[in-house]
């Protein structure tokens, strides 16, 4: 197999037609997963750099609290920006 079509079904029809709606939905899901992974990676990197001065075998209490608070703030900020962006997109689409 070439890897591209391995996760896609052709819609279960015997006619051989590709179900483009199903493929589009799978692509959307894969993009959403990739975006979530990127968000988590960025958040982890930023909070690690901010909170962990000298990496060691374990985190002390203050580092644990810093990482937890940093991640909470990061997610809060991301949610605010995401809502504002989606709201703006909806307004722009309504103008068209």
Curated annotation (Swiss-Prot):
Gene3D superfamilies: Mitochondrial import inner membrane translocase subunit tim13 like domains. GO terms for cellular component: mitochondrial inner membrane. A motif (Twin CX3C motif) lies at residues 47-70. Heterohexamer; composed of 3 copies of TIMM8 (TIMM8A or TIMM8B) and 3 copies of TIMM13, named soluble 70 kDa complex. Associates with the TIM22 complex, whose core is composed of TIMM22. Its main location: mitochondrion. This is Mitochondrial import inner membrane translocase subunit Tim13-B. The keyword Transcription does not apply. It is a peripheral membrane protein. Disulfide bonds join 47-70, 51-66. One of its GO terms (biological process) is protein transport. It comes from Xenopus laevis (African clawed frog). It is found in: Mitochondrion inner membrane. Pfam families: zf-Tim10_DDP. The gene is timm13-b. Keywords: Chaperone, Disulfide bond, Membrane, Metal-binding, Mitochondrion, Mitochondrion inner membrane, Protein transport, Translocation, Transport, Zinc.
């Amino acid at each position: 197999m070439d890897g591209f079509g391995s996760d896609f079904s052709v819609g279960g029809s015997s006619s051989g037609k590709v179900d483009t709606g199903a493929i589009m939905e799978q692509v959307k899901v894969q993009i959403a997963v990739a975006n979530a992974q990127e968000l988590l990676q960025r958040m982890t990197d930023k909070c690690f750099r901010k909170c962990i001065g000298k990496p060691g075998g374990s985190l002390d209490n203050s580092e644990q609290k810093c990482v937890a608070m940093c991640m909470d703030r990061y997610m809060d900020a991301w949610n605010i920006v995401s809502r504002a962006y989606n709201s703006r997109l909806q307004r722009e689409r309504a103008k068209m």
